[in-house]
Amino acid sequence: MSTDHMQQLVARYLAHRRQLGYELVSSGILLRSFAHFADLFAPGLPLTTELGYRWALAPARLSPRYRIARLGVLRGLARYEVLFDPRTEVMPKGQFASGARHRPTPHIYTIAQVRWLMRDAKLLEPSWSPLRALTMRTVIGLLWCTGLRIGEAVRILDRDFDVRAATLRIVPRKFSPERIIPIHPTVVRALQHYQRERLKLYPRSQHLFVSHSGQGGLSLRTTIEFYFRWLASPLRPKGSLASVRLHDFRHTFATNWVARWSRQSAPLPHHLVLLTRYLGHHKFGDTFWYVQPDRRALRHAATTFQNYRDNSQL
């Protein structure tokens, strides 16, 4: 039996899931960690409940929520592998559960923080990767202005960027439909500037954004997330997580718009439907979680949001 039996299994599973449209960035990291653990302490053996628990519970300092996440990724792997190896055991649900589903409170960025992040991105300008700082600045600005998922931003192709119409085409992915989103003229100019600089270095790339190797997609996302953690490390998160995230730009975008509509006494139900469509959500309830009612301007909006979500058939 190969000494990297579990690593091969995980690689096959991740390739299968990614062909279906799932990115599995954080899940992939966890699964590869488990594979190394299994090949070291149980070489050649199948995925069992006991082995899964040994890995999930190994670091004593882990929170129950993180242990649930570790077991969750193993459960998906086990459901796949049991089709090929009947010795595989699927871990039962409900372990370490603490009642209602918990969603972490995101960080809501201020304008000053976004400006600081974009300004300090120039520190990421090594001589062998002249585009890195500009990539980070432009992507951060785009997420702030549009509320896109980072996975959507790194998959944008040149042909998806319509300068005349001032729009971006977001390709369908997973449970999110294809959509065309309008962008501000300042965003158009920033993207045009980035595109010109990128074409000088990587004229054959079809991706709007690229890494130092000229690649977009998952490779670029991994690079951006790595350097963003370093860049944003001085920021103190206001939410329940240990650090700020790229995904918090999406929460910030939704929260700021709902707050603005509330202050303007705009017809919230109508605008909330538009926000749901804009963010690429199929269900109105999915958008509800993006709005954080932690500001005075949001109290009325949050109540309206809650009532509309509970009574809407969207």
Which residues fall in each region the model found?
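Conserved catalytic core of the tyrosine transesterase superfamily
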Residues: 1-314
